[in-house]
Amino acid sequence: MQKHNNMIWVITFSAIIALWLDYLFIQHFTMSESKRCKWILLLAIIDSLFIADAHLFYLLSPDNISIISDISNWAMFAFMILALARQPFNVTYLISRNKWIRGCGAICSIIVVGIFLHGMAITRTNYVVNNVTITSDRLPASFDNYRILQLSDLHIGTMIAPETEISEIASICNSLQPDMIAFTGDLVDTRYNELQPSIKEALKQLKAKDGIYSILGNHDIVVYIRDSIRLTPKENTRRLIAAEQEFGWQVLDNQTEYIHREADSIAITGITFSQTLQEDRHSSDLSQVNLEDLYINTPKECYNITLSHIPQLWSNITSLHPTDLTLAGHVHAMQIAIKVGQWRISPSMLLYKRWSGLYSEQDKYLYINDGIGYTLYPMRIGARPEITLFELKCKNKAK
């Protein structure tokens, strides 16, 4: 629960700043004291809307059932629209008497509201397919042009119309005709029973010639459930794994499987997100995490693709094994990524060394998928929900 407690403090600080600016703003107007108090009270209610909800959610509720999680997400969105978006106008009004500068502040606030609404209504489900080519002299020639599709972070419990959204995602994925699909964790947001029968049927639509391989993410292992009496976290996770197996997915639990072409093979290794990773899942340094047993029986000469929900484990992985391609998710680019020229700017840059897209070191590659779903607020700005299609190329064959 540490993540949530930290987030509450960040949002509380933001609300206090917003309330302070609102208070200064109201002081600029001539009005009766009673009317001034009413305005300040109204703005205080708006500015503290999410804070009250968050504290009720995380501190008072016996459990974080899906409806409470949804209320929390939408309350945060309301806070951003009603409180944060107002602040450009407040600041310009306080620092200048020039009507043009104040007008620019008002326009900025209107633009921010528009961006937030567009991120919720449009970008949230505006799926993008990113094509990535990986060339290696370690790839067997029989796997030249092999196509791997990556999905990550569906967070089904937060979807507004999950059956419709998943059916659309499955249709896009199937049209790409992948040889294999890799799912890198966080299928659900809170618990396994988000997988209603209609949603299970929608997920079963996903098809790939060599099957679908998946791993568990932090939301999949039920770390956000408080009430463990009715159904323990272990049992929730067991049922989630059983559901994925029912779809025909192969859940990799710190193990390696092989895909064969003629006499050649490539290895698919999956790292299960564990309780021991929970407290450090947003840390940039996970050097203390021990993965020594992960590749103990995996031949180093075999081309290897490793699935890891959190990208921070890449350094641990590559120090142990000549892993050729590591696929990760988790970060979502914090659902905000603004493109400026050739650069993408995101708040996730403050927390993560590697946060989105392709990274390479000494012919080893890491790809961080921006995910499909969302957490904390129901919108995406710039960071569109992503489906990634990899095409593997044999360097020796290319010659």
Regions found by a protein language model. Give the residues of each.
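Non-catalytic terminal accessory segments
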Residues: 1-125
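Beta-strand secondary-structure signal
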Residues: 88, 131-133, 389
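Hydrophobic alpha-helical transmembrane segments in integral membrane proteins
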Residues: 113-138, 158-160, 164
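Soluble catalytic domains of enzymes that build or remodel membrane lipids, polysaccharides, and related
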Residues: 141-399
